[in-house]
Amino acid sequence: MTASFSDVRALVSESFPESLEQLKNLVRIPSVSWSSFDPENVAQSAEAIADIVRETGVFDKVQILRSLKSDSSEFGQPAVVARRNPAPGKPTILLYAHHDVQPPGDLAVWESDPFEPVEKNGRLYGRGAADDKAGILAHVSALKLLSHVVENIDLGVVVFIEGEEEFGSPSFDNFLQDHHDLLAADVIVVADSGNWNTETPALTTTLRGNATFKLTVNTLDHALHSGMFGGAVPDAFMAFAGLVSTFYSESGSVQIEGLQKSSIQTPEYSDEQMREESGILDSVSLIGDGHVLERLWSQPSITVTGLDIPDVAHASNTLLPSVSARISVRVAPGQSSEDAFKAVQAHIAKHIPYGAEVVFDDVNLGEAFSTDTTGWAAQAVTSALGQAWGTEVVDMGVGGSIPFISSFVSAFPEAQVLVTGVEDPDSRAHSPNESLHIASFEQAIVAELLFLAECNSREL
């Protein structure tokens, strides 16, 4: 690197207002990728991102590409891809983020328009501000400045900005297959996670896997009068509620035979911090056993995330013949999601009350992830994060899942996969009033520029 650290920080600081303005422009595009929303917004977002990638001057060609969804004749949402090949002996770095966002949800809960960015108390509020449009701008802003801190750009660079991550990446596997050579890299940087807090950067080293499915419980062939038959005939919700109670121990830990735990090192973190960050009510206790971070990072969890039953306003005095639920299982690193799902299936078959009929549908599996932090790229990104923030970096687990990472690992088994991001505990990704800590965003650009400069000097 020909520039000093102070030069790097000054360059980023000088250009940061433009980066922030570009981020605001992206947030204004309601690029929700769910099938019930207007796909033209996602297409508009892809065009806007292609334009800012072109402005870096790093690439000769920037493309907007689509692939067919798995098991479908329908194309997925548009992705933005650009590639610059490396000089001989130099590594290629793939920079991933996604430009689609979650639906805004209940607008009445938002304190401002979700698609009109608002700065307040050092944060930028808006849907996608943190997840994941700031990740896009961290990549682009660092690339735009790279030529100012190295003599020649010798490393290879791939920019891959997906357009359907929030909808489960239905065309992702086909996309990797269709464009394998275009995307091939030695290092893959996934900017879709977060930091320990606004003062402490983190490298995400583990992610739980997931197994989600629809479960239907049937006890009757039609609804029955609750006075005429209640007390003698079980309804479907009664059976379902009894089943759910068997998922947990008295402490709230998952007690499903065959679901595994793993061992992980955890940084210092208290139950009080968890209470404060989660917003749990004062009267409510935390659940589970072991260190609170082990419960999130290295133990399984199971949650009913949706339920199809009559709403209170329209409920009649009947026994329900059928109940359907969406169930989410988080899988500890080290266990395959398929094995975890089979364990849950076996538990349900064994413990469903009253001999009720159960049907499984819409099963989606995503693998857990763990990375080797001894690789040269992991060491380089840790060093860059530490320099940018001026403090030690936390190796952090995340209780959530990023299922497409396992697709990256399968498609490019020799690549080092690094998971970074700009979120923090107050970002509220996927929730109303999502926000980005603006100073952390600037630090992320500094860190990425330092990392790319180090990669540029690396010989394979």
Feature map (PLM): residue ranges:
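A short beta-alpha structural unit
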Residues: V329-A332, V358-T374, V398
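Acidic-enriched catalytic cores of C-N bond-cleaving enzymes acting on peptides and small amides
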Residues: S226-L307, Q335-E357
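Zn-dependent metallopeptidase/amidohydrolase metal-coordination segment
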Residues: T216-N218, F240, L307, L319-V323, ...
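Acidic/His- and Gly-rich active-site-bordering loop/insert found
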Residues: T2-R127, L146-L155, I327
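Short pre-catalytic strand/loop immediately N-terminal to key active-site residues, enriched for Gly-Thr
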Residues: K120-D131, T391-D395
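Acidic/histidine-rich catalytic neighborhood of metal-dependent amide-processing enzymes
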Residues: L124, A130-T206, L460
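Short, solvent-exposed beta-strand/turn "edge" segments of beta-rich domains on protein surfaces
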Residues: A232-V233, H314-P321
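Acidic, glycine-rich active-site loops and adjacent beta-strand->loop/helix elements
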Residues: H99-V101, F160-G168, A191-W196, T219-D221, ...
